[in-house]
């Protein structure tokens, strides 16, 4: 089979996965890594070259969508790193938050989601649908990712048949846009430091926003996917039998320790 990982980071998941497939006796025909960063691709190659399990697999690097294929697609913390829009509730309606310059510094600037924004169909359409039956207080700030429709459509064009697994930070829409979550979820990460000011060290920080999983399901459905559902990572791991695997690993470790003590007695 084939596995396509989108945004593979340093290659850690790829190396571990190939090791597990080898232990199970089901090696992959091809492991494709889609990453546009030359620096990250070099790190991934270095990591996989040091992995014995990767030696028998055709590891391929891509900087764009592959040719149509059948297999599994995996992405970890991918959707939350996509470009996002930010909005502010004012007088009971959402205003678009953009960026302005004030006294030589970058600042947030709010403007109505009509008039100049009237042609921005993605912004207006999403908020009209998402907030149709959700009441948010003035001053509330939130984020959403407008690119999900295009992304799933592109993925659907190359995936003939298979499964897509996406692990990300996020919540279903009603929980994400909760009236008490007034400052949104925009976060910035730089050298193991986290903060919420994207204007601090611009261009150096990784900017993320939590994912509206309801929007993910809607976009996937529009692109022709059948959505199996979404769950927490804890429930996913427990459902996959991680407790039994942990117990088996502990039993193996105990047997090994016992054999070692007998041998040295």
State what each model feature region is.
Residues 27-35:
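Conserved SAM-binding motif I beta-strand of class I
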Residues 37-39:
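Conserved SAM/SAH-binding beta-strand->alpha-helix loop
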Residues 10-26:
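Conserved SAM-binding loop of SAM-dependent methyltransferases across substrates and taxa
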Residues 50-64:
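Conserved SAM-binding strand-loop segment of SAM-dependent methyltransferases
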Residues 74-128, 179-190:
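A mobile, often basic/glycine-rich helix-loop segment
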Residues 126-265:
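Long, Lys/Arg- and hydrophobic-enriched amphipathic alpha-helices
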Residues 44-45:
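Conserved SAM-binding loop
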Residues 1-9:
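Conserved class I S-adenosyl-L-methionine
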């Amino acid at each position: 089979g084939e596995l396509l990982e989108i945004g593979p980071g340093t290659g850690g998941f790829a190396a571990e996965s190939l090791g597990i497939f080898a232990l199970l006796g089901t090696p992959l025909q091809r492991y494709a890594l889609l990453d546009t960063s030359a620096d990250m691709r070099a790190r991934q190659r270095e990591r996989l070259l040091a992995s014995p399990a990767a030696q028998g697999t055709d590891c391929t690097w891509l900087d764009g969508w592959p040719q149509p294929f059948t297999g599994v697609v995996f992405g970890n913390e991918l959707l939350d790193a996509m470009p996002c829009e930010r909005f502010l509730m004012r007088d009971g309606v959402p205003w678009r938050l953009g960026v302005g310059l004030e006294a030589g510094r970058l600042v947030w600037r709010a403007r109505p989601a009509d008039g100049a924004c009237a042609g921005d169909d993605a912004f207006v359409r999403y908020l009209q649908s998402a907030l149709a039956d959700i009441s948010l207080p003035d001053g509330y700030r939130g984020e959403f990712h407008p690119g999900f429709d295009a992304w799933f459509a592109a993925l659907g064009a190359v995936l003939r048949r298979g499964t897509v697994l996406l692990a990300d930070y996020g919540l279903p829409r009603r929980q994400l846009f909760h009236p008490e979550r007034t400052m949104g979820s925009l976060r910035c990460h730089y050298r193991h430091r986290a903060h919420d000011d994207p204007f601090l060290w611009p261009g150096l920080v990784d900017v993320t926003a939590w994912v509206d999983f309801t929007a993910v399901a809607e976009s996937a459905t529009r692109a022709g996917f059948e959505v199996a559902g979404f769950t927490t990572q804890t429930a996913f791991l427990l459902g996959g039998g991680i407790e039994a695997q942990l117990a088996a690993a502990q039993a193996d470790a105990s047997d090994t320790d016992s054999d070692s003590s007998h041998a040295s007695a």
